[in-house]
Amino acid sequence: MAAVREPREEAAVGEGEGEEEGRWGGLLPELVEEVVRRVEASGGERWPARKDLVSCACVCRRWREAAAAVVRPLPESGRITFPSSLKQPGPKDFPIQCFVKRNKKKSMFYLYLGLLNGTMDKGKFLMAARRFRRGPHTEYVISLDADDLSQGSNAYVGKLRSDFWGTNFKIYDNQPPYDDAKTSSTRSSQRFGSTHRFGSRRICPQISAGNFNVGQISYKYNLLKSRGPRRMFCTMECPSTQETWENSLKTKSLRCTGTTVLRNKAPRWHEHLQCWCLNFHGRVTVASVKNFQLVATADPSHPDSVGDEETVILQFGKVDSNIFTMDYRQPLSAFQAFAICLSSFGTKLACE
């Protein structure tokens, strides 16, 4: 009798959950939007209070649609709310301040959203990466789950792959940067299909997953002196800022905004300190060859493109033995910025 009774109990629980969700989903759309709007207004601009908005979006489809309508995308609001924010470009007028924690023994790197100023800030966990050695190459697998860094996982968001010398890198996204983008022919990309299971943690489950090349990073030979600053160049396929993430999900299409070319900002030599210096505005406190600032430069393949030598798009620097700050802004996303910063770890032969 017990074997017959258990399925009935499970069925009863499932029916109860469906009935409960039906009651929440049956509320007027205007009422649901007003509730979500008040939750955001009641101190939900920063984490951890902002998790209440995520809870609202998890109730059912109607509440999720209301949250998408009320909560503005990262480029407009300047706030990271949902996992989709990690693939959206940062705000234009100010940087998103994050920090990276390194665990050398486990070859792990953790990205956090900075909530407070100071190295004692616990932060809001965003992504994690782990370094793997695969033959002559080194790979950094990036995931939304620090405990699951498999490329076959729904938490997988992309990876960074280096050459043998550790001077040239390619960034792979698990989702296409634009329509008709071609996936790489690596073995790991063949494990992904177009299907997804309910409850997927992927940033955009509606779009087929794979490994799409969205950026390249190269470290050039150091012509100044030993232990001098690294010379760094990045070519990135950046996400569109002209349409909201919600619209891209509805149309299942993504736009290509062209290529962004970045290079490291040239430091100045400080005679008194006898070292190369950059102005990090107090965000970097420990001298390190890993410290850098990236600015936009003109694209050689487009004669009409214009660079901006003053606005720092991404800066990365050391504040403790295993803690680094990471500040990024438009046109980079958090995922792209994190991947670029990961490339600074490890020895660069003939570059330093």
Swiss-Prot record:
Q: Which Pfam families match?
A: Tub
- Stretch list, region Disordered: 1-23
Q: What is this protein's name?
A: Tubby-like F-box protein 10
**Family assignment from sequence similarity:** Belongs to the TUB family.
Specify residue ranges for compositional bias: Basic and acidic residues: 1-11
Annotated tissue distribution:
Ubiquitous.
Q: Between which residues do disulfide bridges form? A: none
Superkingdom of origin: Eukaryota
Q: Which residues form the F-box domain?
A: 22-78
Gene transcribed to yield this protein: TULP10
Against SUPFAM superfamilies, the record matches this protein to: F-box domain (SSF81383), Tubby C-terminal domain-like (SSF54518)
